[in-house]
From Swiss-Prot:
Disulfide bonds: none annotated. GO terms for biological process: translation. Keywords: Chloroplast, Plastid, Ribonucleoprotein, Ribosomal protein. It comes from Pelargonium hortorum (Common geranium). It comes from the Eukaryota. Its main location: plastid. GO terms for molecular function: structural constituent of ribosome. It is found in: Plastid, Chloroplast. This is Large ribosomal subunit protein bL32c. One of its GO terms (cellular component) is large ribosomal subunit.
Length: 69
């Protein structure tokens, strides 16, 4: 198992930790922005399937007419 040769300085540790946290912060901001644009309908990168006409999704619901008793 590999072991670091020297102890990492606290400033370098803090810098790396802040970089790691910053990446998560930007990812969260992008996700919130995308969710906001999807909810308002301003998204240009996703299709909104629920705004399509209903004739594409209509399915026969009355099975009594098709069944023979």
């Amino acid at each position: 198992m590999t072991v670091p040769k020297k102890r990492l300085s606290s400033s370098k540790k803090r810098i790396r930790k802040n970089i790691w946290k910053g990446k998560g912060h930007w990812a969260a901001l992008k996700a919130l922005s995308l969710g906001k644009s999807l909810s308002t309908g301003n998204s240009k990168s996703f299709f909104r399937f629920f705004s399509m006409p209903t004739r594409f999704f209509s399915m026969p619901t009355d099975n009594k007419k098709t069944k023979k008793s």
